[in-house]
Amino acid sequence: MGALPEPAEDVLRRALVSEFTVLGPSGRPITHPMIPLYDGERIYLHSSILFSKKLAHIKANPKVSLAITDLGATHGEPLTHRVTVQGDAAVIEDDPHTTWQRILPLWIEKEPIVKEFYAKRVALPLFWERSLIEITPRRVLIWPEGSTERPPVVHELTGVA
């Protein structure tokens, strides 16, 4: 088991889409559909460096939320739980050409077609200039069996660096 409760880890490993929420300059939440990638400790997202206001929003306020609510958005069996992870995000942009590549194996595992696109990356060079978003989970809410008719099971995470 990694840093998160097992049901949350299962959802993060299998979900193809999540709702990633940042706070805009006015303090209002702004939500983006994103592919969640999980390495057993941190949650990773990635974003093009072009036209990405979400990166500026994270730098201004690192408090974020990642919700996975679409039980059918997987390659295999439907998800059995809905999950929201609240935490702190950091934008890692040391080198937009290579820094994000450390999550490439996770991305390919989730979306095998990415391997084919990556092989043809010279055709879309600006698409592959990416920033890495690293989320340190602080709190996890789990709705067992996906039912929102009951309150979620809440896990406050301690000892997560």
Regions found by a protein language model. Give the residues of each.
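Short, basic/aromatic recognition patches
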Residues: 1-19
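Amphipathic alpha-helical interface surfaces
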Residues: 8, 54, 99-103
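Structured helix-beta-strand junction loops
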Residues: 14-15, 60-61, 138
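Short beta-strand segments
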Residues: 15-50, 56, 66-70, 77-80
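Short acidic (Asp/Glu) patches
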Residues: 48-52, 67-72, 110-121
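Short, surface-exposed beta-strand-loop junctions and turns on beta-sheet-rich folds
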Residues: 51-53, 149-150
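Active-site-adjacent structural patch at catalytic or cofactor/ligand-binding sites
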Residues: 61-71, 81-90
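Charged, gly/pro-rich active-site loop segments
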Residues: 77-161
